[in-house]
Structures are given as structure tokens and as C-alpha cells.
């Protein structure tokens, strides 16, 4: 019997974050970071961008992919904080 695993993509993560921010589950790190504001989120993005660079220079592809996923996560939280939709971002790709 084949097993299927749900793989998140950019759109599903954005929707998951939308739901989490709207529902505000107790103990959510996402909600806590969201509430701390733009400055806090900006620092997280800078931190993750640095970790992506270091991983690209010195670590495995798996570690690089993990760091890149974390950067994308924080970029999406920032987008939500500013009220951006995916269409706003996609219009510049």
C-alpha cells in the first residue's frame, strides 16, 4: 500500500498562516511573532537570510533547503503583517 504525504507549498503555507493568525491558537509562536510587529519580523528575516548564506557556503543541500524554508516562512509572516496577498507578491515575479 502506498503512503502519501502532504507536502506544503508556498500557497498552502500562506493559507495555513492566514488561518493561524485569524484563529490565534494559544501558545502559537507564529501569532506571538506576528504580534511583536514589523521590527521583530525584520530581525527574524535578516537572521534567517544569514543562515541561508552560511548553509549555502558550508552545509549540506538538506540543511540549505531547511534554512531556505525558514526564510520563506518568515517572509510570509511579514507579508501577512503588512496585509499583502500572494497576488501582490506574484505581480513582481
UniProtKB/Swiss-Prot annotation:
Protein biosynthesis is among the record's keywords: no
ATP-binding in keyword set: yes
Class of enzymatic activity (EC top level): hydrolase
GO BP, sorted A to Z: L-histidine biosynthetic process
The organism's place on the tree of life at top rank: Bacteria
Gene Ontology MF term list: ATP binding; phosphoribosyl-ATP diphosphatase activity
Name of this protein: Phosphoribosyl-ATP pyrophosphatase
Amino acid at each position: 500500500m502506498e503512503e502519501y504525504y502532504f507536502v506544503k507549498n508556498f500557497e498552502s503555507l500562506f493559507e495555513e498562516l492566514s488561518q493561524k493568525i485569524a484563529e490565534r491558537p494559544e501558545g502559537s509562536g507564529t501569532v506571538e511573532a506576528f504580534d511583536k510587529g514589523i521590527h521583530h519580523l525584520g530581525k527574524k528575516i535578516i537572521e534567517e537570510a544569514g543562515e541561508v548564506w552560511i548553509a549555502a557556503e558550508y552545509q549540506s543541500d538538506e540543511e540549505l533547503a531547511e534554512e531556505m524554508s525558514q526564510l520563506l516562512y518568515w517572509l510570509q509572516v511579514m507579508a501577512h503583517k503588512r496585509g499583502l496577498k500572494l497576488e501582490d507578491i506574484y505581480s513582481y515575479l
